[in-house]
């Protein structure tokens, strides 16, 4: 890899493997869901004999369930009206929303073939490493069924029927509908570009959705909304940087595509951060402890279980390219933490319990600590090797 980071903060896209913090008062007793623990390497025959009819290529072996005390659910019931007033306005009317076709060649027009030719000519000017990052971002967006599933694991705010009229459920469905356009648009662009192996990309998407994700939010909406606040900010940054680099390479249409997606992510970030702001008003102690808990566990990116059927380190390798290009970096991770802590006024919280004060102290000292570690890592960094990516027909890209 191009960079190795201290365990305090993994590469921004990389799943961190840190020990869980001690049980805190904002949690109820934990229920652990255990799968098979680590074991010595087995032969391929032994592995095959142990497999079920279908086994995801990436499995999470330890998960914590329902860590929020049941009485805290009342907080989210009490926020229902506020959610309607403060959350739903951040959704856009479908009739006024952009659609993928607004940015792509029109297949019904006489000039369709010429438009595709122009798109492909612009795409030829983009380097392979840029396409690796753009494909990785698209695959992340295409795993949307997983993210709706994740939101519907959260106690007190899930869509109980699939068409629930509660504000929480309406938001989740409409947020999903807005996000759905992102993967559609990038997928169609990449298909038309002629620069990528669509079958390998489609396999990666299927593998990823089948594997799911483990954000370690524990069915707990405190943790869940902190996670989504961070994630929406991260995707805003990432798509914004791919937009900037597309412009630098002369593809103004692709820059517009990525910039439009980034604007959506920014709007969604605003909605999720408002939920956490309200939680800090109602339950500052529980919320600051939850924030510290998520940061101790580290924010794992949604596509951390990515696999293409070949590369066991695909996600790490994709992350290294994103880090090297400056699309999403350890510095961005620290910047997002600093932004959220400032937005939520963590430093100025008062009246906290002993545990809340410890969480506050930890959060206030974390950003400079991450920055110091990143600076040391960059000073020690060596040039990464070149490896093939199946997404771009096994052409080699430097990590």
UniProtKB/Swiss-Prot annotation:
Name any Gene Ontology BP term.
fatty acid biosynthetic process
Enzyme's top EC category: oxidoreductase
Q: Where does Fe cation 2 bind?
A: 179, 232, 265, 268
Q: Which domain of life is it from?
A: Eukaryota
Q: Which reaction equation describes what this protein catalyses?
A: octadecanoyl-[ACP] + 2 reduced [2Fe-2S]-[ferredoxin] + O2 + 2 H(+) = (9Z)-octadecenoyl-[ACP] + 2 oxidized [2Fe-2S]-[ferredoxin] + 2 H2O
Q: In which tissues is it expressed?
A: Developing seeds.
**Keywords carried by this UniProt record:** Chloroplast, Fatty acid biosynthesis, Fatty acid metabolism, Iron, Lipid biosynthesis, Lipid metabolism, Metal-binding, Oxidoreductase, Plastid, Transit peptide
Chain positions recorded as Fe cation 1 binding sites: 141, 179, 182, 265
* The protein's Enzyme Commission number: 1.14.19.2
The record's free-text note on cofactor binding? Binds 2 Fe(2+) ions per subunit.
One short Pfam name that applies is FA_desaturase_2
Q: Where is it chiefly localized?
A: plastid
Once renumbered to this chain, the transit peptide range reads 1-34
Q: Which cofactor does this sequence's record say it needs?
A: Fe(2+)
What does the protein in this record do? Converts stearoyl-ACP to oleoyl-ACP by introduction of a cis double bond between carbons Delta(9) and Delta(10) of the acyl chain.
How this chain assembles, per its entry, is: Homodimer.
Name the UniProt record assigns to this protein: Stearoyl-[acyl-carrier-protein] 9-desaturase, seed specific, chloroplastic
